[in-house]
Amino acid sequence: EIVILNADRDGIEQIAETLKQRQNIAAVHILSHGAAASLQLGGTELNLSNIESYRNYLETWFALPAAEANSNYSITAKPEILLYGCNVAATEAGVAFVERLSQLTGANIAASDNLTGSAALGGDWELEVTTGNIETPLAFSAEAREAYNGVLADLNQTTGDFNGLVNAI
């Protein structure tokens, strides 16, 4: 299922609302522009400086419904979040951001420490930094990755068109 965030609304809140309506989510793939220790989610830039202010939302992303939380229900594997965005895990601050996001969501996280996207622009599709074991494959086929002609770079730049990549999922 593909969910496109409204660019005029808080993206962290939108993701929380979306995940609250679903159960047994194994993985969430987030396609966004990024920078070191920062990710654009809808109309919100989530970063190391403001992540604590979103704690209440982030902690609900994979929370069990009350009935399941009070039963013998258990999840055998941690959920996973794959962050497709340039340089999100670059620098010590970037790694700290990814680790804190993992702690708050309870998910294993995979993120990139370099450009994500077209090899012709110096990018790749490897998510080099992880906070745990990531078993989920990339969301995009090899053909879609090769066809994408941009990178998911700095939040202040427009580099690449998401439409071709989103349509390829």
Mark where each language-model region is.
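Functional beta-strand-loop-alpha-helix junction segments that form "active/interaction loops"
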Residues: 1-25
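Stable alpha-helical elements in mature extracytoplasmic
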Residues: 11-15, 54-57, 93-97, 144, ...
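A generic secondary-structure signal
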Residues: 17-21, 60, 64, 167
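Catalytic cores of nucleophile-dependent amide-cleaving enzymes
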Residues: 26-120
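Low-complexity, Pro/Thr/Ser/Gly/Ala-rich linker/spacer regions in secreted
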Residues: 68-70, 149-156
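Caspase-like cysteine protease fold
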Residues: 111-152
